[in-house]
Amino acid sequence: MSTLLFRSTNGQSPAVNLRAALLAGQAPDRGLYFPETFPKFTPDEIATFARLPYHEIAFRVLSKFTEGIIPRDVLAAMCHEAYNFPVPLEIIHVRVFLMRLDQGPTASFKDFAAQMMARMFGRFLREDNRRLTILTATSGDTGAAVAHAFHKIPGVRVIVLFPADEVSESQRKLMTTLKDNVRTVAIDGKFDDCQAMVKRAFADPALTHIPLSSANSINIGRLLPQSVYYFYAASRVAQADEPVVFSIPSGNFGDMMGAVVAREMGLPVKKIVAAVNDNDAFPKFLATGHYEKISPSRNSLSNAMNVGHPSNLARLVAVYGGQMDETGKINKLPDLAAMRRDIFSTSISDERTVAGVREVWDNFQLLLEPHGSVAWQGFQDWTAVEPLGNSPAVIIETANPAKFPVEVQKVVGWEPDVPNNMLASLKLPEDFDRMAADYEKFRTYLLKQHPTT
């Protein structure tokens, strides 16, 4: 198999291999890297996944992208080390399941990508004898997952930006207590401000002497590992070649794009439900063909999804033959008919989010947090317009309910237990910087962090 190449969604940069795409984060033309072609699995190959543990499925999926870049035995070891935690699938009712992606080091689905990315980054930097600074904007969980995964990785410095007033206490403490090679910066603004500052830094001529990369879902290294758990879920809940419905809480659309990648690789998918909160730019676009960013983004209980312009829409538009630039301008419309056939999207209010937590607890004794509740309610909206039939469905729960103790307590009357993987961080002293949502100040901060002499 030849080495797979990745192209920019803006189409003005040369195609590169996975190593180059991963280390760069964003293409020089400000587009996002995406596979030129999707490697495929045969139905027989996918059928064998039912007998395999998670780390082995991860190896088989990711090896399709790392051929010629990472030796197979090295990749297998990386997968075994990265995925040493369970991936529970709980039955809600007949053929409808809840997949909890909250068992990793920071109790978030972001651990699945961050743990693998850190190992890939570490290997590539050692091979090249290089140093790198990773800039990451977080709306809640990415920062903690990236900070923990890259903590004390030689050659890597991590700088995380988060909206000061829009993350929960536990989300904040999971990233502000690490120190060493990790710095966190509270921004007096929205997540979109944080993300815009990171993107500007990549394109800033004054910072070209600083080797920068990103661990946000603009980095292809985040996206590819997130395709694995869709293969895993299907292998546990579906018969051979049986299509699955996935309902996914969607903010920056990296999680949802993992399902799209899996489908493009051959996984039978009946429908992808992209459930959003009050930041409803995508369902409106899907309905009307007109895209308008939400600025500023709207606050919701599902705070990790408070994204007014999802970066990964550029990749989704590209899959369907269109082109969206980094500002959200659509230069070529995608095939909307095909997109509507494959994807259903709906906006869930905070009131319905609260109702979903209560409904699932009262009826099924399963505890959701706000993001999982958005996915549950999105699934309900889809089944109101299309029949599920006998197809299996998987609702994605992206964070541990203990990250949202106040919200959960208001609904069910008690606070969820804090998992052991979170307890230690919550007891440590915090250390973070704070600044206005001002790019010039952020540039000065970066220059001070990276003196040239």
Language-model segment annotations:
Residues 1-453:
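PLP-dependent amino-acid enzyme catalytic core
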